[in-house]
Curated annotation (Swiss-Prot):
PANTHER family: 60S RIBOSOMAL PROTEIN L35/50S RIBOSOMAL PROTEIN L29, LARGE RIBOSOMAL SUBUNIT PROTEIN UL29C. The keyword Zinc-finger does not apply. The gene is rpmC. This is Large ribosomal subunit protein uL29. It comes from Chlamydia trachomatis serovar L2 (strain ATCC VR-902B / DSM 19102 / 434/Bu). The keyword Ribonucleoprotein applies. One of its GO terms (molecular function) is structural constituent of ribosome. It comes from the Bacteria. Belongs to the universal ribosomal protein uL29 family.
């Protein structure tokens, strides 16, 4: 639980551009992991799929919260 709270605190401190970069980097890493799993007969740590997806979702939620605060 501590790591998740630290990640949320770090994400809340980031600007919108930094959040976009974080989301982009995580999407690239998720794509690379999927490609590695599909194209190579290599063992992939499957729990990483959900970790990347959850990190992306958290960043998108925080980005939306910031947008609502500005326009709300």
């Amino acid at each position: 639980m501590g790591a998740k709270k630290n990640l949320l605190a770090e994400l809340r401190e980031k600007s919108s551009e930094e959040l976009d970069e974080f989301i982009r980097d995580n999407k690239k890493a998720l794509f690379a992991l999927r490609a590695e799993a599909a194209l190579q007969n290599k063992v992939v740590k499957t729990h990483q799929f959900s970790l990347y997806k959850k990190s992306i979702a958290r960043a998108l939620i925080i980005k939306q919260e910031k947008k609502d605060r500005v326009h709300g």
